[in-house]
């Protein structure tokens, strides 16, 4: 963020810093510990961005009561706030309700506002009456029917006989009070027979048949434990009278639970009172959360399909939240100036807090990466000591970039014991150091200072909401830019699509014009004329910009115009004749302008237009022969004018060719005079110049012959044009179709011949200019070589001037010796031009060593030193250094003892070693063809074997 966008904050910070500096400047000890190292506080200084972000409020660590979590929150307050309140500011939940499972557990209030149309709320459960308690229903049901009465039965003899069979027991009167409740299940067998005659449809009789089992168990217990009872101690009637009122209710709670679990639909429900049965309404509601958020009934409730889908969506959201990077709120570093100026002061403050929070999160993530890397080293060393594999647990956090770290990565890192231990130790150390530092600070600073402000949960949620809003705005703007760029790219990459679009637009315009013509013909004629004039101007501009594209478009437009003309001829023939005459006049003017601008393109276009005109003429002859005769006469008049213009152009070209011939003849004369002057200056180089002129003369003869042949062809064509034009007039008078077709074919042939002649003339002109430039370059090169002669040639020239008679005697001998070698060299040069492997002339390797660098010369042209094997099998090309040799002593003829024919080991041309040359016998100075020829004139040992290429 740029500095000028925080001007209000900067002003406040400067005033605050100035106020603090006035207070603390008296004490040197306190000034030493300040962050700013300024010694003079007379002039206020604008703080840097780092200082501004450093003065942002800190974050309160979260207190949970768990020592390990408290240590983590103390070490990483920003990360802890992100992990704790992460459900508040990701993109999908910041505008909706907060799920209960992601909310903080210590809620301030149990009252929750729920919107009825909110589909993301987990607390949205259909409100209904509590299910009835089956145990209460069972207790409300009577155990026996209301009309049921026990029959009068004397059970005394039966019980007495049963007890009489037991062994005799001593009478224990003290146990009567305690023993009376114990045999309470005993009267159950007496109650078993009466329900048998009752109807089977009576529901209260269902649980009664389960009672005999506890009764039998009770009899066995009585037989073993209470054998001391006898019939004398008990009376059956009194026993029944005491036990029936004190009948304990059976514990049927487990039965009700099983029934609710396995048969939820069979639970009998009491009808609720009127007005109490209410499902979730369509309006907002206020509900009170229950004490136990996970009640037993809510867990056992069978969920509907809608709730299952909602849970599935919430699980997907939680999974996405695990994969969202923690730094999703990262602000872009570059912003437009207009965007920053439009922000309000509150937005600027929130953005400053957001940037400070972002920097703190990045610093904490880097610290956590270091801790995880240290834990990895500790685990690997411990595993190496124990012989275990150190790669059993992966540590991906240290390898992940900071802007890609997610919540799942941090949770996986915190599962490791070593990471948790290191975090706890670091938190303890920081707690000790922070306590000492706060004590020192409180002891040193005696000024009144307010408590440091901290970022609360509301502040963090606010800055996250701002980041989410900014990210949405940036995403929309970037999407708009990308759409524009992509649209432009598609139009550039697909010209066919653009052509189709233009064609469709033109078709729509044509249809619209036809409709308007039918409605108002007079107005449409004027409008069409103005549109055609505008199109003609637009076409001329586009032809200058892009000729190739305009040709295709013009062809399509002409096809559309031809169809439109045919339709209009059928509708109104008289009006179309006048309009066609005006169009043809405009086309003739347009063709003349295009011929002046671009003749080659216009020729191709004329051929296509003539083909279209021929077809159109045939159609019109069939429709209206009288009108076509008049039109043909006007076309012939236009063609006659066109032919006259072409004849004038050909005459001008003939004049230009004659001027060019005269100019070339004068240039040749200048060359001959210059060659004669050079021959007079350097008599030693005369044979070479004569031979070169001898090779150039056939070329000049051929060029002159070609020019004369081209001129003869043009004259023949001009002579043939006049009788052809007369024949065309005679054939135009005859309205037969065959004569017109032949006449058009002959016109096309004549135009093709003219085009070929013009192309040949242009090619000849280019060849002549190229040859003239090459001759000029060769003459300049010879002049340079003449100026750069060796001191030896200067001495020879002086000697020749002093002794002209001896020079005249040696001249014919030198010519006779040199002519065979020069002829052989020229023939070989002409034969081997295609096989020339000379890459280029060597440039100066070092400027301070220019003129002394030497290259080993390949004398026989076989390519390189064969004693050294290179990586590539092909021989390197020959490189010749043409630099002027350094001044040295004259050549001394020393034949020595070697007669090897001038190879690398030969001493046939033993030259004393120059001062700055390489210290090797195989290097010789090859400074150009002239110096080598001079050596060959004096020593003819290698005259026929050496082949230097130019």
Curated annotation (Swiss-Prot):
InterPro entries linked: DEC-1_C, DEC-1_N, DEC-1_REPEAT
Secretion signal span: 1-19
Keywords: Repeat, Secreted, Signal
Biased composition (Low complexity): 268-280
Function: Required for proper assembly of the eggshell.
Note: Allele FC1 is found only in strain Samarkand, allele FC3 only in strain Shahrinau and FC4 only in strain Dilizhan. Allele FC2 Is found in both strains Israel and Ghanghry.
Protein name: Defective chorion protein, FC106 isoform
Organism name: Drosophila melanogaster (Fruit fly)
Lineage of source species: Eukaryota, Metazoa, Ecdysozoa, Arthropoda, Hexapoda
Gene name, Swiss-Prot/TrEMBL: dec
């Amino acid at each position: 963020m740029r500095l000028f966008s925080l001007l209000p904050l900067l002003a406040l910070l400067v005033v605050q810093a100035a106020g603090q500096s006035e207070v603390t400047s008296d004490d040197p000890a306190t000034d030493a510990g300040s962050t700013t190292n300024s010694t003079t506080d007379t002039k206020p200084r604008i703080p840097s961005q780092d200082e501004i972000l450093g003065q942002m409020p800190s974050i309160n660590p979260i207190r949970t009561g768990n020592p390990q979590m408290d240590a983590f929150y103390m070490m990483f307050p920003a990360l802890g706030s992100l992990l704790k309140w992460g459900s508040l500011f990701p993109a999908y939940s910041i505008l909706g309700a907060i799920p209960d499972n992601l909310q903080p557990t210590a809620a301030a209030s149990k009252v929750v506002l729920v919107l009825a149309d909110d589909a993301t709320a987990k607390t949205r459960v259909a409100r209904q009456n509590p299910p009835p308690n089956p145990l209460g229903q069972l207790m409300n049901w009577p155990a026996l029917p209301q009309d049921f009465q026990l029959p009068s039965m004397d059970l005394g003899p039966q019980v007495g006989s049963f007890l009489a069979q037991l062994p005799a027991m001593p009478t224990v009167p003290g146990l009567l009070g305690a023993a009376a409740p114990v045999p309470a299940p005993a009267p159950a067998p007496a109650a078993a027979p009466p329900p048998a005659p009752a109807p089977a449809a009576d529901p209260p009789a269902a649980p009664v048949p389960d009672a005999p089992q506890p009764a039998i168990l009770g009899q066995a217990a009585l037989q073993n434990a209470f054998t001391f009872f006898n019939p004398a101690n008990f009376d059956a009637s009194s026993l029944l009278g005491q036990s029936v009122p004190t009948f304990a209710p059976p514990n049927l709670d487990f039965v009700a639970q099983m029934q609710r679990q396995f048969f939820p639909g069979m639970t009998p429900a009491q009808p609720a009172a009127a007005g109490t049965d209410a499902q979730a309404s369509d309006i907002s509601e206020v509900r009170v959360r229950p004490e136990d958020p996970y009640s037993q009934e809510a867990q056992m409730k069978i969920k509907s399909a809608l709730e299952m889908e909602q849970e599935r969506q919430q699980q997907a959201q939680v999974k996405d939240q695990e994969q969202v990077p923690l730094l999703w709120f990262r602000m872009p570093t570059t912003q437009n100036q207009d965007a920053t100026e439009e922000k309000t002061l509150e937005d600027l403050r929130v953005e400053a807090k957001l940037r400070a929070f972002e920097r703190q999160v990045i610093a904490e993530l880097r610290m956590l990466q270091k801790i995880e890397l240290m834990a990895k080293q500790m685990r690997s060393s411990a595993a190496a000591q124990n012989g275990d594999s150190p790669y059993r647990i992966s540590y991906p956090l240290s390898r992940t970039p900071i802007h890609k770290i997610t919540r799942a990565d941090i949770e996986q890192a915190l599962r490791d014991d070593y990471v948790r231990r290191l975090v706890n130790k670091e938190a303890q150390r920081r707690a000790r150091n922070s306590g000492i530092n706060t004590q020192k600070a409180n002891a040193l600073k005696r000024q009144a200072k307010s408590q440091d402000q901290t970022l609360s949960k509301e502040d963090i949620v606010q800055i996250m909401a701002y980041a989410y809003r900014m990210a949405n705005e940036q995403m929309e703007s970037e999407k708009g830019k990308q759409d524009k760029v992509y649209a432009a790219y598609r139009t550039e990459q697909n010209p066919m699509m653009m052509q189709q679009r233009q064609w469709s637009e033109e078709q729509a315009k044509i249809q619209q014009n036809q409709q308007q013509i039918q409605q108002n013909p007079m107005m449409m004629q004027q409008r069409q004329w103005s549109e055609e004039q505008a199109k003609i101007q637009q076409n001329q501009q586009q032809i200058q910009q892009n000729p190739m594209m305009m040709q295709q478009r013009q062809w399509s437009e002409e096809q559309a115009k031809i169809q439109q003309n045919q339709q209009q001829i059928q509708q109104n023939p008289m009006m179309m004749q006048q309009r066609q005459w005006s169009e043809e006049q405009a086309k003739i003017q347009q063709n003349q302008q295009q011929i002046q601008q671009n003749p080659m393109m216009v020729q191709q276009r004329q051929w296509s237009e003539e083909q279209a005109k021929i077809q159109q003429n045939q159609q019109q002859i069939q429709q209206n022969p009288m009108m076509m005769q008049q039109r043909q006469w006007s076309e012939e008049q236009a063609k006659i004018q066109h032919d006259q213009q072409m004849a004038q152009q050909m005459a001008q070209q003939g004049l230009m060719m004659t001027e060019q011939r005269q100019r070339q003849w004068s240039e040749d004369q200048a060359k001959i005079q210059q060659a004669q002057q050079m021959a007079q200056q350097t008599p030693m180089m005369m044979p070479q110049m004569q031979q070169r002129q001898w090779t150039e003369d056939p070329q000049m003869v051929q060029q002159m012959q070609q020019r004369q042949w081209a001129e003869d062809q043009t004259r023949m064509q001009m002579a043939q044009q006049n009788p052809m034009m007369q024949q065309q007039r005679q054939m135009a008078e005859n309205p037969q179709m065959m004569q017109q077709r032949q006449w058009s074919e002959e016109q096309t042939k004549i135009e093709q011949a003219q085009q070929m002649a013009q192309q040949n003339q242009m090619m000849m002109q280019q060849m002549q200019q190229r040859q003239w430039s090459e001759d000029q370059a060769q003459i300049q090169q010879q002049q340079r070589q003449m100026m750069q002669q060796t001191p030896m040639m200067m001495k020879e020239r002086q000697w020749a001037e002093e002794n002209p008679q001896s020079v005249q005697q040696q001249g014919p001998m030198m010519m006779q010796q040199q002519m065979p070698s020069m002829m052989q060299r020229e023939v070989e040069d002409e034969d081997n031009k295609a096989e020339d492997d000379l890459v280029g002339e060597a440039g100066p390797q070092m400027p301070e060593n220019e003129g002394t660098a030497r290259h080993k010369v390949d004398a026989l042209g076989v390519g390189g030193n064969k004693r050294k094997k290179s990586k590539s099998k092909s021989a390197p090309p020959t490189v010749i250094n043409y630099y002027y040799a350094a001044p040295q002593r004259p050549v001394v003829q020393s034949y020595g003892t070697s007669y090897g024919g001038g190879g690398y080991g030969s001493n046939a041309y033993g030259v004393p070693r120059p001062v700055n040359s390489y210290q090797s016998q195989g290097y010789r100075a090859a400074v150009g063809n002239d110096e080598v020829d001079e050596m060959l004139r004096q020593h003819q040992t290698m005259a026929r074997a050496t082949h230097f290429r130019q």
